[in-house]
Amino acid sequence: MAKPAEKKTKKKIKRVITDGVAHVHASFNNTIVTITDRQGNALSWATSGGAGFRGSRKSTPFAAQVAAEKAGRAALDYGVKSLEVRIKGPGPGRESAVRSLNNVGYKITNIIDVTPIPHNGCRPPKKRRV
């Protein structure tokens, strides 16, 4: 009987990156934290929904804190020491995500707000009537 063909698997090489960029996208419903290298290649990411929060609890500052912590710990494997934080969006998890990344042990070099602001572009959604 013929022997099964041996599968050749390539071992994934972890590269060592000393400084990265943390992209925090804080919407009203969720918070997404992505840690990339300087070129924009993603090293790790986490969301408040993926951290176990559902419904209205996804949009809390604590959920953003847990998501940032999760993404930060995953990026430590690459040897990231310092982060530049880019915050986008008006959500409630903006400050708590940055504070959480600081508590994980990263040296935060600078914090930039990259929220897109229209120069009178699209018409905004109608106001809520509660």
Curated annotation (Swiss-Prot):
This is Small ribosomal subunit protein uS11. The keyword Ribosomal protein applies. GO terms for cellular component: ribonucleoprotein complex; ribosome. Located on the platform of the 30S subunit, it bridges several disparate RNA helices of the 16S rRNA. Forms part of the Shine-Dalgarno cleft in the 70S ribosome. Part of the 30S ribosomal subunit. Interacts with proteins S7 and S18. Binds to IF-3. Keywords: Ribonucleoprotein, Ribosomal protein, RNA-binding, rRNA-binding. Pfam families: Ribosomal_S11. The gene is rpsK. Gene3D superfamilies: Ribosomal protein S11. It comes from the Bacteria. One of its GO terms (biological process) is translation. Belongs to the universal ribosomal protein uS11 family. The keyword Cell division does not apply. HAMAP family: Ribosomal_uS11 (MF_01310). One of its GO terms (molecular function) is rRNA binding.
